[in-house]
Amino acid sequence: MRGRHLVNGRAPRSARATALISTLIAATALVGVAPAGAAHAAAKKPAPLTILVTNDDGVAAPGIDAVVEALRTDKRNKVVVVAPATNNSGAGGKSTPGGAPGGPATTASGYAATAVQGYPADAVDYAFDVMHLTPNVVVSGANFGQNLGPFVDVSGTVGAAREGARRGVPALAVSQQLGDAPDYPTSARLAVDWVQARRRALARTKAGAALTEIDSINAPNCPAGRIRGVYETTAAPGPGTEAAIRTVAECASTATTFANDVEAFNAGYATLTKVPVHAA
């Protein structure tokens, strides 16, 4: 698959500019013709979103805190945090037979949350089955550590997102590169951008039949959060993936074409990939 460069999760500016000019020309031609209520309907803001935020690093982890605080800046978002009580990295899609118990907790910034004594997927199940939550979208992360290539199948972050998708709810897993100073503000911003770009569609979400895939974002640690952009691509194949991931991304690289998420990530891009709901 040939990769696509995205700007804040959208097509490049030139493409958007062309579309905008066409829209303006069409709108000008229709001035005074549209029904009186059309302008009001077009300007109507989409309904607020209920966003279930979870992770695998635990409810008090800095990554989930960054995502929650970033999502809360938009007052249209109702952010509900349900996450494992402790670190469950590497849990994949494991779940507890009969479910796991939960109780009140807070994030690192003091936002009210529910801590579940189980796996990341258990936290999602608790939100649906015990709290009877009906979210528009599930956001899992930001994880401490990238989940590239085949590592999605052992990731609790991805496992939680997959559980949401099995419930028929669109889901995003977001992960930040390992390092002494993980750039959570960048991965949190990318999560917000992803939600915003899909806001109108997400507002119409009705849980039902299981979805077939989730989205996964992986962000490298670049100086001052200056990732080169978002590159939509496919996951790297299994053999040799771990050795191919660089510990320090080349954020000053000038390469622009990549075969998979590992190559783009190594060159300073955040990657956006589609991940099947069921593990390989």
Regions from the language model: what does each represent?
Residues 54-57, 82-87, 116-119, 140-144, ...:
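Active-site-proximal beta-strand/loop segments in catalytic clefts of secreted hydrolases
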Residues 2-41:
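Secretory targeting and sorting signals
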Residues 153-159:
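Charged helix-capping and loop-helix junction motifs
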Residues 46-47, 69-123, 134:
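A cross-family phosphate/adenosyl-ligand binding-site feature
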Residues 165-187:
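Glycine-rich phosphate/pyrophosphate-binding loops
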